[in-house]
Amino acid sequence: MQLTGSIYPWFTAYALLKSTLMELINSFIPYKSQTGKAPKCLVPYWLSIRLSLLYFKLTEAISFTEKCEKYNISLFDSTFVFGYIVNCFFIIHLNTFLTSQ
C-alpha cells in the first residue's frame, strides 16, 4: 500500500495532535484524593510523569511512524494500538503509585 495521497497520515497526525493536547491539558489538572484535596507533595512528581510520558509518546510515535512508512504498514491501526498500550500502562502505573501512598 502506497502512503502517498493516502488518508492514513492525516489520521495519524490528528491522533497525535489530539493525544498531545489531552496530555497537556491533563498534566495541569492536579490529582484529587478522596478527601477532595490535592496532595501537595505528589503534584510536582505527577506533573513530571505526565510531561515525560508525553515526550516519550511523541518521540516513540514519530520513530514508529517512520518505520511504518518504510515498510508500508497502515499508520492508522498501528498508531492507535501503540497509543492505547502506552496509555493503559501509564494509567495502571499512576493508580498503583497513588494508591500505595
Curated annotation (Swiss-Prot):
Residues 1-27 form the signal peptide. The chain crosses the membrane at residues 42-64, 79-98. One of its GO terms (cellular component) is nucleus. It is found in: Cytoplasm; Nucleus membrane. It is a multi-pass membrane protein. Keywords: Cytoplasm, Membrane, Nucleus, Signal, Transmembrane, Transmembrane helix. This is Uncharacterized membrane protein C27F1.10.
